[in-house]
Amino acid sequence: MNTIFNINPNKKHIEYYIYADDLAVIVKGEDYRSAVRIANFELRKLNNWAKGHSFSFSAHKTKAMLFFRKTVPLRLPLFLNGEKLEWETEIKYLGAIIDNKLKWKPHLDYIYKKCLGTIFQMQKIVGATWGTSPKVMNMIYNCIVKPALLYGSVAWIKCLNKVTYLRKLQKIQSQACRLILGVQKSTPIAAIEVILNLRPLHLEA
């Protein structure tokens, strides 16, 4: 896959991002039409490169997204190997859900539900007088829930300036903290975080 960078030595309008067998192509243009024109030209070159390396790109697994400040009423077609690509408003790439407005709300909603599900599973292995010890529960949170909660935060960190998003993600950590120590909901979360040596999420992200 590394030889794919040789396709276009002039990277003024094109950027490639490769991880294992996942490829993302970023195309920049002076306007919408020029960007689509450049993208179609690049897709043809990628397809020719693939054929020359006994390789193929799957058109039905390839998605397109437009990042544009204004609303575009007509989406010009993009083609890969003669097949028309679908325009999407959200794309999941390497575990992160990217939306075309770069608001990150779909991604934050996704990780909230994912981490909340893990918290529910943690509730099944602990009780008031039985179950996993607080030390192990704390380890589960720090090794499983917290990394998932903060995944990709370098990209969406600015969203935490919005109280709604911060409150939503902090709710996960608050639930986990109370579950780990087995305390009531009325217990101040700041005190619990100090006991568990956890920082508030807006300082962690």
Language model feature labels by segment:
Residues E83-W156:
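Basic, alpha-helical interaction scaffolds
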Residues L23-N48, R69, K103, L160:
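Catalytic palm subdomain of template-directed nucleic-acid polymerases
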Residues M1-I26:
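Active-site palm subdomain of RNA-directed nucleic acid polymerases
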Residues D22, S58-K70, M139-I140, Y165-K168, ...:
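A glycine-rich phosphate-binding loop feature that marks nucleotide/adenosyl-phosphate handling sites
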Residues Y32-A35, W104, W130-M137, K158-Y165, ...:
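Residue-level recognition of alpha-helical structural elements
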Residues P134, N161-A205:
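Short linear motifs embedded in intrinsically disordered, charge-biased segments
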Residues Y16, V36-A39, L43, F57, ...:
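Hydrophobic packing residues in well-ordered alpha-helices of helical domains and bundles
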Residues F41, S56-T89:
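Short, conserved micro-motifs composed of acidic
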